[in-house]
Amino acid sequence: MGFDDDDEDLVVYGTPIEREEDTSARKRRAVAEAGQLRALPAWKQEVRDEEGRRRFHGAFTGGFSAGYYNTVGTKEGWTPQTFTSSRKNRAEMKKQSIYSFLDEEDIKDMGGNALETSQQYDTFGFTATEHARKQASKEQKERPSAIPGPIPDELVVPATTSIGVKLLMKMGWRQGRSIRDAHADSLYESRREARKAFLALSGTKTGGQKIQVDSHKSDKDDGATESFEELHASGNTPVYVLHPKQDLHGLGFDPFKHAPEFKDRKRLQKSARDRNRSDVSMRGSLLISNSGQYAPGFGIGALEELGVEDEDIYASGFAYEQMEVDIEPSKTASDSNYKLEDRKRGVFLAFKIASSSEYKLERFDPPEIPSDFDGRHKFLTPRQDVNNLSDLAPPEVPAPEDTSLRLLIEGCAAMVARCGKHIEDFYKEKSKTNTQFNFLNEGDGCSYYARKLWEYQQKYIDQQKPDTVQSKSSDKLTAENRGKILGERPLDRSTKSSSSSFPAKEAIQLQSNLADNFVKPISLDGLPEYEKPFRNDPAKQARFEQFLKDKYQGGLRPANLIPTSTMSDVDRARERLDFEAAAETIEKGKEKKAMDPLSLLGLSGINEQRFVSSTESERSIPARDEKSIYPRREEFEWRPSPILCKRFDIVDPFMGKPFHVQRPRSKMDSLIFMSESTTRTNEVESSSIAPQHTSVAGATETEAKGAATDPEIESSSVQRPVDLYKAIFSDDSDDDMAEPLANQPVDPVKTSEDANMVLNRLVAEDFLESLGKELGLDVPPEKPTPPNVLFRSETPSTANAIGISRNRKAITCQEIKENESALDKEEIANASADVPSDNVEELGLKYEKQEHRAEKSRSRSSHRQTQSGSLDSDSTSDQHRSRERRSRHKIRSGTPGSDSSIEHHRSKKRKSHSKHRTRRSRSPYADSSDSQYTKRKHREKRHHRTRNPDTDSSDHEYEERHKSSSRRSSDKDRSRRRSRHHKR
């Protein structure tokens, strides 16, 4: 297909459109019906192939489809043939073939795959292969070729010869000939000829004539069949086929191909061995046939073999002259002679043995095994490998006479053996300038240096070996070996064995030896004063120290060093438990090297409370013990906080049960989680609180002492963790509670119970209040406190409980002072109503001085709080915010009582203000500043708002008290006016 020059650069994309005349009519019809077929419903559409023919499903004997959809033309589709059979018309057996399920195209495709015989399976080549070979040879003769002669069969005929044909051809078979043994025919012919000769010699004349006639006839018959046998018998059978393969050479290999003389020699030797073997085995009996004789009249060539046809099988009689048997010598005797000496003739025909041989047989003795030889191989370590592969030990050489040279050689050898070869190289470099080291360069003392170097190297290797030698697998691991492996130090035992029948002196000596072997622990060298928990009871303290000795000190000891016969078993067991607890506390106190004085003070307080009660306040702080102890496992009871149980809406499992004082587990635990009673006692003792009713001078002294001890108090006060819920929901009246006195006894069990009760009541009130606010309900008013009831009249247990609840908010000593000063002011304000008019001015002056002192103390405390840490400031700010929130709520809720009581309070405040105003105008010492009046007014309001939540008093009683107080105030005013009028 050619293109023009202009169209050479064009590229054709896509499939070219066929011409209409090239397509068949069926294809044109399929293209035309393609658009119509898409518009038909699914069940009417027919599947067609690329030629436009309907697709044929080859699943049945007929039909294009096998179902309802896309059927041949009926709704049912293909219908199978009905089975009919009768007597006249029997049902025929239909034989199905593969052509019943194929269409025309499939049959056309399979038409060329018929089964036929091929030349590949023509095993014997009688027909196809032979014909092809002959045809190829004829064609080769007719046409000229560059290769002269016939073409080999491997180039013309394909390789269709099977392996069986190849093997037969190797064995002597040829194409077109029968497979039979030609040697059997020759054997038969030889026997027949021998029979003829025997009859001719032993028969009569007539018989001989008949035999000649018969032989003549038989010769004719043989001549007739000879030509046939020559045609069908093998005439060119190889020699190696007659002789079976009995050597180790390859198939068809002849080692004597180019040396026929060696081949003849070998054949003669083999025939001689066979003859000797047959003579020994067959000539011993008289009844056996004379098979070893040869038939007379037959000559044997020099190079011919003695075959079966040469035997005289028809000979009669026995060979008596050959009865002597030559017995071959034994094999052992023949083996003793040398083979070369036994052969007088040459081994081969063309060789001769020399008269004198230079060959001498030499025998070598086996090597001698040394006595220290071990058949098992021992693998050496890298260091041993290097040392053992070195040269052997040098011989011993006497030391040089020069002492300085000998010392120098020994020192140099020791240094080289320890440090390595580089030290020797360094000394060799030094020998170039210093003649003393000439022994390193084959000088005087070289042999002695080599010997000493080897000795030091061996000594160094021996030192590097481990001390413990591995025992054999059969040895058992004893206690001593185990102790050595683990690095344990054995106890020093005395030479004499211990026995119960020792005299007294030997027993004392044994005990002293044991006491010297055991070292006393550091804790027993002398207990410090603060680590003697039973020092108030000397007998018990002595028993405790003996308990520590028995626990930590070994050796022999008497059964009862301290008599305890007066104690019962229960008391003795309880005392032992106390001793163990005390010893454990002392050990825990020695975990760290240093401990600050406050932690030692708290630890001593805990020990005193746990074992023996004591009122001593000053503790001696000894030096810290540096004994290291191992960690111990402890079990303690964890109790959830009541507020935690409330938040999770569960019942407190420990409700009403006293708190158990836990042992401090570390230094921080002893600081923070110290017993409340001990902390409160220390605070009370160090705060130096002034009494309730003090004079102006006494108050001044108390203020000076408090200012002097402020730094110490701040250093000893520890901020406990702030509970957020308690800081928010605790009552504001807790800040106004007073601490119990220092001289009152404290019961820790009762204190914990009261603290739980107060805390639960406060939490419940706060919860109800918050719930009422959320539901939009009014909060019920709290019951007021009588005006003549003071907080100092509370019981010690209640005060302790309130103190514990306040301690949970980390109250410092400065806050305690402020609360007490506020209480003093409230007492003065309450007592001013009952004071006569003559002492009003004195009380006012006293009140103003206390106010001034409280203001100064508050300013100092605020200044210290600004300098304190972030944690304290945050906790204090949270407390102030919670107090302001509660105060605002109380102002909104108002004072419980009727509206008349509120008006009564207001009138009372106005009267008190007018009274103070009058007193200020008459007092020469009064301060006329408005700020003091404002502060006093707020303080009085706080006093009126303060009430005790635990007091049970009805509203009626509250109103009556206020009415009586108002009547008393009116009477006092009238009496005061009378006195003024009288003075005038």
Curated annotation (Swiss-Prot):
Gene3D superfamilies from the UniProt entry: Surp module
Region described as Disordered: 130-153, 464-503, 679-717, 775-806, 820-984
Main subcellular location: nucleus
Highest taxon of the lineage: Eukaryota
Composition bias type Basic and acidic residues, residue spans: 130-144, 473-495, 843-858, 947-974
Keyword check for Zinc-finger: no
Localization: Nucleus
Keyword Coiled coil included in the entry's annotation: yes
Compositionally biased spans, kind Basic residues: 882-892, 905-922, 934-946, 975-984
Domain G-patch: from-to ranges: 160-202
Coiled coil regions in record: 814-859
InterPro entries membership: DUF1604, G_patch_dom, Surp, SWAP/Surp_sf
GO CC annotation terms, alphabetical: nucleus
Function summary: Functions as a component of microRNA (miRNA) and small interfering RNA (siRNA) biogenesis. May assist Dicer-like (DCL) proteins to efficiently process and/or recruit the precursors of miRNAs and siRNAs.
Cited PANTHER family: G PATCH DOMAIN-CONTAINING PROTEIN 1
Name used for this protein in its record: G patch domain-containing protein TGH homolog
Organism whose genome encodes this protein: Oryza sativa subsp. japonica (Rice)
